Amino acid sequence: MVNMKASMFLTFAGLVLLFVVCHASESEEKEFPKEMLSSIFAVDDDFKQEERDCAGYMRECKEKLCCSGYVCSSRWKWCVLSAPWRR
């Protein structure tokens, strides 16, 4: 009976170790493409798009006005598409 408990414990510990090793190697593989893409598409601070003074689609419109083509929803207080059926 003791040998069976020990073998089950070792099997379980081995599976946990295998899971941890696989997860660690997978997370390293996922980091590589992110780093590569961020270095390729890095944008200089001078070329960053300036923030607009209006709120876009589904953005809060309490302090800011909605951008053109959007209206502030009276119920939800965020910018929605302007349409003829909207009030």
Swiss-Prot record:
<feature type="disulfide bond">
    <location>
        <begin position="54"/>
        <end position="67"/>
    </location>
</feature>
<dbReference type="Pfam" id="PF07740">
    <property type="entry name" value="Toxin_12"/>
</dbReference>
<feature type="propeptide">
    <location>
        <begin position="25"/>
        <end position="52"/>
    </location>
</feature>
<dbReference type="GO" id="GO:0090729">
    <property type="term" value="F:toxin activity"/>
</dbReference>
<keyword id="KW-1015">Disulfide bond</keyword>
<protein>
    <recommendedName>
        <fullName>U3-theraphotoxin-Hhn1c</fullName>
    </recommendedName>
</protein>
<feature type="disulfide bond">
    <location>
        <begin position="61"/>
        <end position="72"/>
    </location>
</feature>
<dbReference type="InterPro" id="IPR013140">
    <property type="entry name" value="Huwentoxin_CS1"/>
</dbReference>
<comment type="similarity">
    <text>Belongs to the neurotoxin 10 (Hwtx-1) family. 51 (Hntx-8) subfamily. Hntx-8 sub-subfamily.</text>
</comment>
<comment type="function">
    <text>Ion channel inhibitor.</text>
</comment>
<keyword id="KW-0964">Secreted</keyword>
<keyword id="KW-0800">Toxin</keyword>
<keyword id="KW-0960">Knottin</keyword>
<dbReference type="GO" id="GO:0005576">
    <property type="term" value="C:extracellular region"/>
</dbReference>
<feature type="disulfide bond">
    <location>
        <begin position="66"/>
        <end position="79"/>
    </location>
</feature>
<feature type="signal peptide">
    <location>
        <begin position="1"/>
        <end position="24"/>
    </location>
</feature>
<dbReference type="GO" id="GO:0008200">
    <property type="term" value="F:ion channel inhibitor activity"/>
</dbReference>
<keyword id="KW-0732">Signal</keyword>
<keyword id="KW-0872">Ion channel impairing toxin</keyword>
<dbReference type="InterPro" id="IPR011696">
    <property type="entry name" value="Huwentoxin-1"/>
</dbReference>
